[in-house]
UniProtKB/Swiss-Prot annotation:
Enzyme class, broadest EC rank: transferase
Family assignment from sequence similarity: Belongs to the DNA polymerase type-B family.
SUPFAM superfamilies per record: DNA/RNA polymerases, Ribonuclease H-like
KW Transferase (keyword) present: yes
Gene Ontology molecular function, alphabetical: DNA binding; DNA-directed DNA polymerase activity; nucleotide binding
Catalyzed reactions: DNA(n) + a 2'-deoxyribonucleoside 5'-triphosphate = DNA(n+1) + diphosphate
Protein name per its UniProtKB record: DNA polymerase
Any one biological process term the GO annotation gives: DNA-templated DNA replication
UniProt cross-references to InterPro entries, sorted A to Z: DNA-dir_DNA_pol_B (IPR006172), DNA-dir_DNA_pol_B_CS (IPR017964), DNA-dir_DNA_pol_B_exonuc (IPR006133), DNA-dir_DNA_pol_B_multi_dom (IPR006134), DNA-dir_DNA_pol_B_vir_insert (IPR013617), DNA/RNA_pol_sf (IPR043502), DNA_pol_palm_dom_sf (IPR023211), DNA_pol_type-B (IPR050240)
Top-rank lineage group of the source organism: Viruses
Annotated EC: 2.7.7.7
Length: 964
């Protein structure tokens, strides 16, 4: 049998210390280190690099006033020779203003021109074979990584990614299990050792027979490594072993010593692995350890972020990935429980057929299901329940999907299962919808019940084993279908971090890798200065001009507005030429502005005048050469467009398509985070002036387009825009543009928000039908988009694109950032979908009864906007509906569905008042539910209620004094 070959490469990873050359010659410690390196060049495991004539830049700015605004106040630092020490120990207690907190791996990647997740052709002659701790592996030492990774290559084939998903269950009797008291009852392992040569995919279930009542059957007491090696080679997918708990603990250690790329758990860093460590301690076993090339290390589980996030750092190439931490970092969900996450991902639209004591589920062949069906049928193979309207239904028959559990991973069986029907048992909740969404989640087995382990029989243990199996498969499927490995690769390359650190840090730390790389490419280094951070105005939001819009409205927005602003004005901290602050003196403002126009002309420079309260502030930027931050944005934007193009080109190659999708995602995050970092005091190269300029330029651009387009007319095939000056060059723009639309109309700006405008169109003549109206409106909006974005018209600079995004046929503009309407999703045939922002319809903290009342009220208003009803008819309908609804609630208050009155809130655990009602509610709940506690950052449901001792006539009046 052909086996894959695994090599381990050893490199020298140093501690890095950067300072100017002069300091290295005057400081006694640095001088001693440098002399030793020079003296013992070949034997001393340290070195240094001289960085000649580096450009030193700073974010510090000297504020000017009316009395000195003509003076040159730009802080200019001389070029300097720097020295970068590379030592096996950390150089401490020596201050160097150049020694930023750059991760040691980033220096390694940059100095050796290596992509952390790149592919390279390796010349083995650059390696030296060495003996290592693990005798089963081949290892090499590399003295010159730059030479070794000289030839990058592109891989368009699937590179196997091996992972193992682990889930444990523990014995308990109603209280939360603790390792010093309760044994582990089950460990389930989804062993997914992918390989192009010899893949091994198993579901291994370990069951503690010692706690099973009157257990009789095959059992394992002594763990023998070679037995497991042999077992894994057998052609059997499901392996169930009844064993002692000690055997289970040895098996976990055996698993961790295999060459997996990922160890997957869900909340396993804070519970599963901590519990396993505790049980090993209970038996006086050594703690779990990881074997790397040169030694064995104990598995270290640590917490930061106030004990809400637990991490396991790996030093042997395995990535310990807690999917709970990953989901919380990447997504914003109501709940981060595995069951709720699964429902979000694994669902399809299906037809429901009532068939006696069962329902038949028939998935629909729709566009919405197209990208979901293969995922759904992969997950359902181990599921025992499905969920409809959040109600669990036990699966009765899925033999058309999988009739032999040994075919769990069989690709032909999976392919043949797509769109096959399955049956579910009926329960106390009938399904009234003919078509509905069917979701997969954790199985509806309440192992948290205090009686789950009472009279614990083999049958009971097997039921829990099925549940445990499905949990591990869910984790594996989340990993697979969320393309987590592709994201790890993309973020690793983007942040210049080892792959196991891809999701570890926040934006301020993540971006420092790209910052260092850009600085190094420019032969530059930063010196941070003292800056004043003041609050400044945010994005420009217009008040809605109308509430009820019964005509066609388009949404236009600036594509990547803030990154475009940074490129346009060269908003990099070292490019701030002047900041002049004036008091409330318009005469002085005019003098300063005229001076700046003459002394700092566009396009070499640009400036922004910002008025706040009774002060004026001029910020002048040097545009002659792109700054460091501008280069980062510009390169990121170009890469984003390149990845977008490559993604489309490779849509038939799933490997490259997934890679470019994730690369595009990581680029977007980087590009969009830089504006916020400029205004963050935690970022090394920040600038409140650049951040304020960026926001002000955004306001200026959106106001400019608003003033240019609002009430502009298209008459006799000519569009007449309003007279405006270009916001960048201050030159007047052309206002007349010819077309061939053959209609007369007027554009109205009815709303705007930060980077977008809502443009309403009013035609002089009526159309015969809705389709013609929509088609012509689309044509007119497209014409406007072409006019604004055509570089020949010089309405915008080349860095900006004001895109026509979507079109509403009616809208309700309720308030700023709150609107509802119907969007055109397809032109031919005409199809509409509902859309809303900021309303209770999509807010998580609003009750269902609130959403229902709002939705029905909107439907009445929609009828008014689309069917020419009178306003009086609409008012009557709304009043009658609301009166009926509230009367019905009051009269049936004893029989109301409590679920309709639930509110949702995120528990922060940080409240000024210790008696705050949310804090008291959570503490009370957690004391009663120790095995299902609400943790910090988790969203939960609650209701406002008052306990009634006697239900009398007075209480029935529902007086507010009885509510709390």
């Amino acid at each position: 049998m052909k086996l894959k070959k695994l090599y381990i490469f050893y490199f020298d990873i140093y501690e890095y210390f950067l300072c100017d050359l002069q300091l290295s010659e005057t400081n006694e410690i640095l001088k001693y280190i440098k002399n030793n390196i020079d003296k013992y060049t070949n034997s001393f495991n340290s070195s240094y690099i001289i960085l000649k004539d580096f450009n030193i830049i700073t974010n510090e700015v000297e504020l000017q006033s009316y009395y000195n605004f003509t003076e040159d106040s730009k802080i200019k630092l001389n070029n300097t020779d720097l020295i970068l020490f590379m030592t096996p120990y950390k150089i401490e207690r020596i201050y160097s203003k150049y020694n930023r907190n750059f991760n040691q791996y980033r220096w390694f990647y940059i100095l050796n021109n290596i992509e952390p997740a790149g592919s390279y052709k390796i010349n083995m002659s650059n390696l030296q074979n060495i003996n290592i701790y693990d005798k089963n592996k081949t290892a090499y030492y590399c003295k010159n990584p730059k030479l070794l990774f000289l030839t990058p290559i592109e891989i368009d084939k699937f590179i196997p990614v091996s992972r193992v998903s682990i889930d444990i269950e523990c014995q308990h009797f109603g209280e939360f299990p603790t390792p010093n008291k309760f044994p582990i009852s089950h460990i389930c392992i989804d062993w997914f050792m992918e390989s192009n040569i010899n893949p091994v995919k198993k579901i291994i279930t370990l069951i503690n027979y010692e706690i099973i009542k009157n257990y009789k059957g095959e059992q394992k007491d002594r763990f023998i490594y070679t037995e497991i090696d042999e077992l894994l080679t057998k052609d059997k997918v499901y392996i169930t072993i009844y064993c002692t708990e000690k055997y289970m603990l040895h098996f976990i250690l055996y698993t961790l010593r295999k060459d997996f790329d990922y160890i997957l758990t869900y909340n396993g860093h804070s519970f599963d692995f901590t519990y396993i460590q505790g049980r090993r301690k209970f038996y006086n076993l050594n703690e779990l350890c990881l074997v790397n090339a040169h030694k064995s290390n104990e598995l270290k589980i640590y917490s930061y972020n106030k004990d809400t996030t637990y991490e396991i750092d790996s030093n042997n190439g395995i990535i310990f990935l807690d999917l709970y931490n990953y989901i919380k970092k990447i997504y914003n969900y109501n709940s981060y429980k595995l069951g709720e996450i699964a429902k979000e991902r694994f669902n399809i639209l299906s037809k429901i057929i009532d068939n006696g004591d069962e329902y038949i589920i028939m998935p629909l062949d729709t566009a919405d299901n197209k990208n979901k069906v293969s995922i759904f049928y992969d997950v359902i193979r181990t599921a025992n329940y499905c969920f409809i309207n959040n109600i669990p239904y036990k699966i009765k028959d899925k033999t058309k999907i999988i009739n032999d559990k040994e075919k769990l991973y069989d690709p032909i069986s999976i392919e043949n299962s797509l769109y096959q029907q399955f049956k579910i048992y009926k329960n106390n909740t009938p399904i009234s919808d003919e078509t509905t969404k069917v979701m997969l989640s954790k199985d509806d087995v309440d192992i948290g019940n205090k009686n789950a382990y009472v009279n614990f029989t083999k049958d009971k243990s097997d039921d829990i084993a099925y549940y445990c199996t499905h949990d591990t498969v869910l984790c594996n499927c989340i990993f697979k279908y969320d393309m987590i490995h592709d994201k790890v690769i993309a973020f690793s390359n983007e942040y210049l971090l080892p792959q196991y650190m891809s999701f570890k840090y926040k934006s301020t730390t993540n971006i420092s890798g790209l910052l260092l790389k850009t600085l190094f490419c420019n032969r530059s280094m930063i010196v941070s200065g003292n800056l004043e951070f003041e609050k400044f105005e945010g994005g420009y939001v217009l008040e809605p001009k109308q509430k009820y819009i019964d005509s066609i409205t388009a949404v236009f927005d600036f594509n990547s507005e803030y990154p475009s602003n940074i490129i346009e004005a060269n908003l990099s901290p070292e490019k701030v030429e002047k900041v002049i602050k004036l008091q409330d003196d318009e005469y002085a403002v005019d003098i300063v502005e005229n001076y700046l126009k003459e002394k700092y002309p566009y396009p070499d420079y640009c400036y922004m005048l910002i008025k706040k309260d009774k002060t004026y502030k001029f910020i002048v930027m040097d545009r002659r050469k792109p700054g460091i931050i501008t280069q980062m944005i510009d390169k990121g934007m170009k890469s984003k467009n390149e990845y977008k193009n490559l993604k489309n080109i490779n849509k038939n190659n799933p490997v490259l398509y997934n890679y470019y999708t994730s690369a595009l995602y990581s680029k977007k995050i980087t590009i969009n985070s830089l504006y916020g970092l400029l205004g963050s005091e935690r970022f090394d190269f920040n600038s409140p002036y650049c951040a304020e300029y960026c926001t002000a330029l955004g306001q200026k651009c959106i106001k400019y387009i608003k003033n240019l387009v609002d009430k502009s007319r298209y008459i006799d095939n000519n569009l007449y825009l309003n007279e405006q000056n270009n916001p960048f060059s201050n030159e007047p723009v052309i206002t007349r543009y010819s077309g061939n639309l053959d209609v007369n109309f007027t554009f109205y700006i009815i709303y705007g928000d930060t980077d977008s405008l809502f443009i309403n169109i009013k035609f002089d003549n009526k159309f015969d039908n809705k389709e013609d109206l929509v088609n012509k409106s689309h044509e007119c909006f497209q014409f406007l988009s072409n006019i604004i974005n055509d570089e020949k018209n010089i309405i915008l600079s080349k860095n900006f694109n004001f895109e026509y995004e979507k079109m509403y046929i009616w809208m309700l503009l309720l308030a700023k950032k709150k609107y509802i309407g119907e969007v055109v999703s397809s032109m031919n045939p005409l199809q509409l979908i509902s859309d809303s922002k900021g309303t209770a319809l999509i807010r998580r903290d609003c009750t269902e009864i609130h959403k229902t009342i709002l939705k029905n009220t909107i439907d009445i208003l929609k009828e008014y906007l689309t069917n020419n009803c009178t306003i009086q008819d609409v008012n009557n309908k709304i009043n009658n509906y609301l009166m009926f609804t509230f009367k019905n609630i009051i009269e049936n208050i004893q029989n109301l569905d409590i679920n309709e009155f639930k509110k949702s809130v995120k528990y922060t655990g940080i409240y000024k008042d210790p008696n705050f009602y949310i804090e008291l509610c959570v503490k009370k709940y957690n004391s009663k539910n120790p095995n299902d506690k609400i943790v910090k950052g988790q969203r939960f449901d609650f209701i406002y209620a008052h306990e009634i001792d006697i239900w009398d006539i007075e209480t029935k009046k529902w007086n507010t004094k009885y509510t709390s």
